[in-house]
Amino acid sequence: METKESTMNDQNTHTRSRNKAIPYLPRYMKPGQPCVVCGDDATGLHYRAITCEGCKGFFRRTVQQKIVYKCKSIERCEISKISRNICQFCRFQKCLRNGMTKSLVLNETERIAKRKMIIDNRERRKLEHLRTLLKASSLADKQDEFQSRIDQVTANYCKIMDNSLEYKFKSNKKSERLIELTKLVSQQVRQFAETIEICDTLNPSEKEEIIAKSWLVVKILQIIHEFNPTECCLMLANNTTYIPAKGNYSELDKTTKIFENLINLAISFNCMQLDNRQLALLSALLIYNPENVKRSKEKIDKIHVELWKCLQSISEMHDDDSSDLLHWPNFLVRIPYLILTVSKMQDFFQDENNINAIANILLFKFT
């Protein structure tokens, strides 16, 4: 006979299936089709027989645990929905007579392997679905449509931003040196911004506003690509380098933390292998961001959307012109990381006491 606990399990299983608003029914079954063992409502084909969940579980446990039953009567007990838990021997024999096959019951190792296969297949289907969605929204095949803008922005970026900044400070005062340096770098970013025609439609205060809010992140984007992945070091001014510090980050001084943040950004972007087109377009996007202005948001947003489309179209393609749908999402998640990290550095780059470190980061050479 089955234990009280087993009886409760069978009843609970039956109750759960009954409580569902629309019980799942395989296409090969008819509504109300009975279990061939006990007559309860069947749920499907289990081990080659149409059975209920209770008889399926009973048969599986019996085979897996190699349980041997004995009948207290003459081995002819009636097995029904009500009496199925009275004699386990006769219930198991009826399972066998009605086609349930012991060889189809998986052992623990086989069950784990099957569960893993199901999970892997589910993840594969999710990935295929994601790839389908990405492909549907892909702009890779529209690159020709944006080529003129891409070429224009890239050429101007290389012409202006690739010029190494060398500077001889005029003052010995830290505060004045910081002003000199800020003007120098922001002027370079301004020159690049002015090559995009929308700049001509902005008034002077709006121009200053977008440069003031973007020059640092644009320059940092450029700096972190002066990264040597082989040596894992950042190339700095006056032929110096920065190698990652050892020890606990929380125990580092303020300046070292800034360099560590730059290294982390560099490592994150290095795996993306961005080319000049992507750097140029992303820099333009960082400048012409609607969040950088209080007014003219609609005007800025128009060029912002166009630049996004240009960047997406080239970021979805490999160098060999084959499609790479996952490169764009991976690129996208790094952009807010860049913006957030640089925003946390603002105070450091506005502190005159950090002028030497700031010059080391932003300039190619200085005296």
From Swiss-Prot:
Gene Ontology biological-process annotations: cell differentiation; negative regulation of transcription by RNA polymerase II; positive regulation of transcription by RNA polymerase II; retinoic acid receptor signaling pathway
PROSITE patterns in UniProt: NR_LBD (PS51843), NUCLEAR_REC_DBD_1 (PS00031), NUCLEAR_REC_DBD_2 (PS51030)
Record keywords, A-Z: DNA-binding, Metal-binding, Nucleus, Receptor, Transcription, Transcription regulation, Zinc, Zinc-finger
Subcellular location: Nucleus
Record CDD domains: NR_DBD_TR
Gene Ontology MF terms: nuclear receptor activity; RNA polymerase II cis-regulatory region sequence-specific DNA binding; zinc ion binding
DNA-binding region, residue intervals: 32-107
InterPro entries according to UniProt: NHR-like_dom_sf (IPR035500), Nucl_hrmn_rcpt_lig-bd (IPR000536), Nuclear_hormone_rcpt_NR1 (IPR050234), ThyrH_rcpt (IPR001728), Znf_hrmn_rcpt (IPR001628), Znf_NHR/GATA (IPR013088)
SMART domains, per database record: HOLI, ZnF_C4
Record domain NR LBD: where: 145-367
Keyword Zinc-finger: yes
GO cellular component, one term: RNA polymerase II transcription regulator complex
ZnF locations on chain (NR C4-type): 35-55, 71-95
Keyword Metal-binding appears in the UniProt entry: yes
Record family assignment: Belongs to the nuclear hormone receptor family.
Protein name: Nuclear hormone receptor-like 1
Source organism per UniProt: Onchocerca volvulus
